[in-house]
Regions:
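Enriched for short, Lys/Arg-rich terminal
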Residues: 69-96
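Basic, Lys/Arg-enriched alpha-helical interface segments
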Residues: 1-57, 61
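Short glycine/serine/threonine-biased micro-segments
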Residues: 24, 65, 85
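Basic/aromatic recognition patch in beta-strand/loop cores that engages polyanionic ligands
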Residues: 49-79
């Protein structure tokens, strides 16, 4: 199993998604969706090569879908770095 690290940008993305969900869908649904991300992080840690490579967006990056959002990550040795969590916006300007 790989270690998972969240970038500061990914942490901010999680906060933004949570607050948006709480405001538009209620706290219970926001909690449910928030915890779904951590379930996906665990799945990524168990098999990070399972998910789609998106070298055309950023070399070395992969993408995993969680609901309507995309988790962008890269593998660094035995660590998975979660770089950003984006909705439908164009990823290039947002990815480090």
């Amino acid at each position: 199993m790989y270690e998972v690290r969240l970038s500061n940008l990914a942490k901010e993305d999680l906060r933004r998604i949570y607050y948006y969900g709480a405001e538009h869908f209620g706290q219970q649904q926001a909690d449910h969706y928030f915890y779904a991300f951590f379930s996906m992080f665990e799945q990524i840690a168990n098999n990070p090569f399972l998910y789609q490579s998106v070298d055309h967006i950023r070399p070395g990056y992969r993408r995993c879908l969680c609901g309507v959002d995309s988790i962008y990550y890269r593998i660094d040795g035995n660590t998975v770095d979660i770089m950003a969590i984006l909705g439908s916006q164009e990823p290039q300007p947002w990815l480090p």
